[in-house]
A protein has these predicted regions:
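Cap/lid segment of the alpha/beta-hydrolase catalytic domain
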Residues: 441-563, 569-570, 604
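Asp-box/WD-like beta-propeller blade repeats and closely related beta-sheet repeat scaffolds
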Residues: 125-211
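Predominantly five- to eight-bladed beta-propeller fold
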Residues: 28-33, 83-84, 171-235, 262-265, ...
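Short, solvent-exposed loop/turn segments at conserved positions within beta-propeller repeat blades
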Residues: 78-84, 121, 204-208, 270-277, ...
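Short loop/turn segments that connect beta-strands within beta-propeller blades
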Residues: 90-94, 130-135, 217-221, 283-287, ...
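Conserved beta-propeller blade repeats
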Residues: 53-68, 103-119, 149-166, 199-212, ...
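Active-site-proximal cap/loop segments of hydrolase catalytic domains
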Residues: 519-737
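Non-catalytic accessory segments flanking enzyme active sites
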Residues: 58-60, 167-169, 192-193, 198-211, ...
Length: 737
């Protein structure tokens, strides 16, 4: 067994000198929420401490390259809300200053007019404000002007390079109807009427669809003087892609004449079963559209080269498989036509994400999860790839948001995080990967916390493979004492336990409560190549669960481990329900958040059918066959869609999958279990959690149910989040301490 160890705290970071935040002195909005001044007792991290941390996001480098604009959200547990305001910092990390102290959140802030002004969204509309005193200690936004009047609100926007045009996201009615659609007098009636899939998605009923509109960038932006990019389409598509797509799915060409965008031009059942999303080139002048002919699965994140001669994007080859390898593609563009499509990462083992062109249009920086760490890479036109960040750097880096020249040295401006701290800005030297943090938003809080230790272990699986497992130890860990342990079961199922930071599944917080926390990167994780990732599809009840038991047995072998829990969300919740019926006496308690309990009924009630169809055993040969209508007589093809992962399929993989559902093994349940679910969870509906709890009660198993009526697959409201943490740790402490 191989081990590598890192300690938390200031010594684990490459920090520049800490500086004092300068703030404006003008009158503050009464609804403003500012940085927390929480005082921590005995260095112990608590849920209250976690929720007090500022959340930094969306950095933007000024046109002159001297100043970084970014936002920070602060949370008030008492008011049960967060508020996001704007900050600036010099590009070298000196002199951080607060730019706004508003009571309403500000988002999507962008430099305009050569840095003399900023455009942003507040209250669902686009605003413009002049910057004043940016180089001093008291910067301000003045002369605030509302530019838009869009009744359905604006979600995001992107301004053309010459700042004469703007594209923005708003909403149109969908095919899902409500009572007032047929009778305006029924404005107090609540119902949804659907005649096809998908009528709900993630956390909302699909009564509206996002569309992207183009308008002149000036005061008076309204629907009547805007052009819908999808206006020529006969069907109701979405742009950007729901539920988590944004402006990263659209990009202006450097000359402002074209917009590249990603869109799944399918509706109903075809939409629900397919991931076939294409890249389209929209001509702003005449509204014509050209598709990049890829077929297959997701094609996303289009990005023009600075010289306008090429387009880069991310592409998955197989329709219906959302965890396919994400390839970095490029194509030439001239005279409105696409040519020379090529895969720059054909020989790269990992998934590409977040492409960023170099200024000379010859190379692309991107990030990728590789062996449990998210790093930054560069690929040249010939497909040669160089890792920029250091291979042994225990951080997760986002893609660079800017490339700067500091004398002879090229630097990347990006953000990073780890299990020790949330997102901060960082500069990375391209030559050697040396990283220097340039913001310290939460240092006044983190510096009060007791240090802990993180370890990387390679655990042997039942078939002799090495599995990366992160292990976090409590502060003041003493191997001669006894500690309870937690095995974290990953969601997804395709994902990775890396150095990411979470405000719910926070492993530093768990270790601070006195637990040894193990994070196994079992079969199905995405940072170890496609073979390791793809093994899990059609084998939910197989090797990946044995991987958890291997990690648990590894932990159990340590003399300092006492009782042991298994906890997880989503697929991790499914894993917990499965382990409850097969673990013997390995675990002393379980926690399942938003887990799948009954695979058969999960297929009937979930929304993204492509995922269930593929992973439940359908795979490629049973996934999606366009062009047919009605039952084909083979027991699998209905409505033109092969449903080989369905409960009625005779496909051997699917038959095995449903036979091994957690609900079929409940007579072996005997270990205390906490079931948590949100009623607005449409990915894994909440009756799955209730069914698991009801069953545990009927089996005589000590159990508890926590239901959040107004939360989805995640827990987002501050007071609900705090309550979630309290229930989580109360249950662990009751059965493991």
């Amino acid at each position: 067994m191989k081990r590598h160890i890192r300690a938390s705290g200031l010594t684990a970071l490459t920090l520049s000198a800490l500086t004092t935040m300068n703030c404006t002195t003008e009158k503050v909005d009464a609804a403003y929420i500012g940085p927390s001044q929480i005082e921590i007792q005995d260095g112990k991290m608590t849920p209250e401490v976690l929720l007090s941390l500022g959340r930094l996001s969306d950095p933007q480098l000024s046109p002159d390259g001297k100043t970084i604009l970014y936002g920070v959200s602060y949370t008030s547990i008492e008011e049960n809300r967060s508020c996001r305001n704007l900050f600036i910092v010099n590009a070298d990390g000196t002199s951080p200053r607060q730019l706004t102290k508003d009571g309403k959140s500000i988002s999507c802030a962008r430099w305009i007019d050569g840095g003399k002004a900023i455009a942003y969204i507040q209250g669902g509309q686009i605003w413009k404000a002049t910057t004043r005193g940016l180089s001093g200690d008291n910067p301000k936004l003045v002369k605030r002007t509302k530019l838009s009047d869009v009744p359905n609100g604006v979600g995001e926007f992107k301004i053309s390079p010459d700042e004469t045009k703007i594209m923005y996201v708003s909403y149109i009615h969908s095919d899902v109807k409500t009572p007032k659609d047929t009778d305006p007098k029924l404005d107090k009636a609540r119902a949804y009427v659907a005649e096809d899939l998908m009528y709900r998605h993630w956390d909302h009923w699909v009564t509206e669809l996002p569309h992207t509109f183009v308008a002149d960038f000036k005061e008076g932006i309204r629907p009547e003087n805007s052009t819908d990019i999808l206006a020529a389409e006969k069907e109701l598509y979405e742009l950007p892609i729901e539920p988590h797509g944004g402006m990263s799915e659209l990009d202006w060409s450097p000359d402002g004449k074209f917009i590249a965008y990603s869109c799944k031009k399918k509706t109903g059942k075809q939409y629900a079963f397919s991931t076939n999303t294409e890249i389209y080139i929209y001509n702003v002048a005449d509204g014509s559209c050209t598709v990049i002919p890829m077929g297959g699965g997701y094609d996303t994140a289009p990005l023009w080269s600075p010289d306008g001669t090429k387009i880069a994007w991310l592409s998955m080859a197989r329709d219906g498989y959302e965890a396919d390898k994400n390839r970095l593609m490029t194509a030439d563009f001239a005279d409105g036509k696409i040519s020379n499509i090529r895969d720059l990462t054909a020989d790269f083992k990992y998934n590409a994400a977040g492409p960023v062109w170099t200024a000379d249009s010859k190379s692309i920086y991107f990030n990728a999860l590789a062996e449990g760490l998210q790093g930054i890479f560069r690929v040249n036109a010939d497909g040669s790839i160089t890792r920029i960040t250091k291979e042994n750097a225990w951080y997760d880096y986002d893609s660079p948001f800017a490339i700067v020249q500091n004398g002879e040295e090229t630097q990347l401006l990006a953000s990073w995080c780890s299990m020790d701290f949330p997102t901060e800005l960082v500069k990375v030297a391209v030559a050697d990967g040396k990283s220097e943090q340039i913001t310290h938003e939460n240092e006044h809080i983190l510096s009060q916390l007791a240090e802990h230790k993180t370890e990387a272990r390679m655990v042997k699986t039942v078939d002799g493979k090495d599995m990366l497992t992160w292990v976090l130890y409590p502060p003041q860990f003493d191997s001669t004492k006894t500690y309870p342990g937690i095995v974290i079961c990953l969601g997804g199922p395709q994902g990775t336990l890396s150095q990411s930071w979470s405000y719910r599944w926070n492993y530093r917080l768990m270790s601070a409560q006195g637990y040894v926390v193990a994070l196994p990167n079992r079969r199905g994780t995405t940072a170890f190549g496609q073979e390791w990732c793809e093994q899990i599809s059609g084998d939910y009840s197989g090797l990946n669960l044995q991987d958890y038991l291997s990690a648990a047995n590894e932990l159990r072998s340590e003399t300092y481990i006492g009782k042991l829990a298994a906890c997880g969300a989503s697929y991790g919740g499914y894993s917990v329900y499965m382990l409850a019926g097969m673990h013997g006496n390995t675990f002393d308690c379980f926690i399942a958040h938003a887990g799948i309990f009954d695979e058969k009924y999960m297929y009937y009630e979930t929304e993204e059918m492509w995922f269930a169809n593929w992973d439940n055993g359908g795979l490629e040969e049973y996934s999606y066959t366009p062009g047919q209508t009605g039952p084909a007589g083979d027991g699998e093809t209905f409505g033109g869609i092969r449903q080989g992962g369905s409960p009625w399929s005779t496909n051997p993989r699917a038959v095995r999958h449903y036979a091994n559902s957690p609900a079929n093994n409940v007579t072996k349940w005997h270990t205390p279990i906490l079931c948590i679910h949100g009623c607005m969870d449409f990915r894994i509906p909440y009756d799955q959690g209730m069914a698991a709890f009801n069953t545990a009660q009927m089996m005589g198993v000590p159990s508890k149910l926590v239901i959040f009526p107004d939360e989805c697959h995640w827990v987002l409201q501050p007071q609900n989040a705090l309550f979630w943490h309290r229930e989580y740790f109360d249950w662990l402490d009751k059965w493991c301490k």
